């Protein structure tokens, strides 16, 4: 198992690295050239700036059984289609059973924003310590689940 992080503006990199290190799991952080990341643990891969360039690079690298951390539903859907697992920075696990609904809701919201004369919507609320805690608990559970599944294959 390998962990890939869609690292552009990802607030949970430290949590991912800490948990991955405790389980001796390799991590790759992917970001575009507009960002600068350093890590003592993870491999950092820079991808040329461009719409979805990081997303497509991440998907080209991940394989069945890998774990992808992303807030992008499209990336999650592509990862799931390759047999990888995916988790949102909120801690929500993406699954084949919920991804279609999530993509449809995203599409409907995008259409509503385009149709609205008020395009000055608020952004997301500030991330809290509780958000980090929720992600940490959920991520740890998912990692342990995947490690147990992989142990059964040996």
Predicted regions and their residues:
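Nuclease catalytic cores that cleave nucleic-acid phosphodiester bonds
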Residues: 2-154
């Amino acid at each position: 198992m390998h962990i890939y992080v869609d690292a552009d503006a990802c607030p949970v990199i430290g949590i991912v690295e800490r948990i991955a290190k405790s389980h001796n799991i390799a991590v790759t952080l992917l970001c575009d050239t507009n960002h600068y990341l350093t890590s003592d643990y993870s491999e950092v891969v820079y991808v040329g700036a461009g719409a979805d360039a990081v997303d497509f690079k991440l998907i080209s690298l991940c394989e069945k059984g890998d774990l992808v951390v992303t807030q992008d539903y499209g990336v999650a859907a592509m990862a799931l289609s390759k047999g990888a697992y995916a988790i949102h920075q909120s801690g929500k696990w993406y699954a084949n059973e919920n991804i279609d609904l999530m993509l449809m809701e995203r599409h409907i919201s995008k259409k509503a924003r385009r149709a609205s004369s008020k395009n000055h919507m608020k952004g997301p609320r500030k991330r809290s310590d509780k958000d980090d805690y929720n992600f940490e608990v959920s991520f740890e559970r998912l990692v342990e689940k995947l490690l147990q599944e992989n142990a059964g294959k040996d």
